């Protein structure tokens, strides 16, 4: 009887409370991470072709890892709540081992997404080179990127990466297909009416600012990639920073059982 009572009193109630609260926050954060990264993999901004052509699409690889980690955080943290309430050494040890595995995978997801994001948006020259190489090119990648750029230029009312002069200052697949005297930039750089009819095609051709989109599309593309990366990396890092002290408390709790 005395032995059973002593065993039942092992572990401070305060520590148990901290573990329960800490793991509840982790499991809720895991669900949020899961939802966030599902949104990323759905590619709502539809910029994956830009990243795929460069071979720097590991932002999406990080998102797939984070989907696994988000669900795993939910499951393991739920188990951690039960382990803390049951006060069983083997359950706490199992919790620590599982959480450590998930922690390592989430670190990989955060680092992978952030480093590849930095490569894509730190300098517009990479995206400019892709645009000039593939826009209007008669290849599968060229057709895919042409559709992507057409959609972005229409929806965001922009032209080129930095502006319409990208098409004039550099050689491109578009220039090889369309001489400058015919059209110095893609016709979709022209301002349009609500029915998508050019307001003044001749004015657009000569570069009149009232009839031509003058801003570049890089701001929109960078914002799209940043939105994906912040959701994966920085929210992931925040979860990791919270999870570490919870794991340390669990280690201490394990030594008291």
From Swiss-Prot:
The gene is Upk1a. This is Uroplakin-1a. PANTHER family: TESTIS-SPECIFIC EXPRESSED PROTEIN 55, UROPLAKIN-1B. Component of the asymmetric unit membrane (AUM); a highly specialized biomembrane elaborated by terminally differentiated urothelial cells. May play an important role in normal bladder epithelial physiology, possibly in regulating membrane permeability of superficial umbrella cells or in stabilizing the apical membrane through AUM/cytoskeletal interactions. GO terms for biological process: epithelial cell differentiation. Keywords: Disulfide bond, Glycoprotein, Membrane, Transmembrane, Transmembrane helix. Pfam families: Tetraspanin. It is a multi-pass membrane protein. SUPFAM superfamilies: Tetraspanin (SSF48652). Gene3D superfamilies: Tetraspanin. Residues 1-13, 86-90, 252-257 are cytoplasmic. GO terms for cellular component: apical plasma membrane; apical plasma membrane urothelial plaque; cell surface; endoplasmic reticulum; membrane; plasma membrane; protein-containing complex. Residues 35-58, 112-229 are extracellular. InterPro entries: Tetraspanin/Peripherin, Tetraspanin_animals, Tetraspanin_EC2_sf. Belongs to the tetraspanin (TM4SF) family. Glycans are attached at residue 169. It is found in: Membrane. Homodimer; disulfide-linked. Interacts with uroplakin-2 (UPK2). Binds to uropathogenic E.coli fimH. It comes from Mus musculus (Mouse). The chain crosses the membrane at residues 14-34, 59-85, 91-111, 230-251.
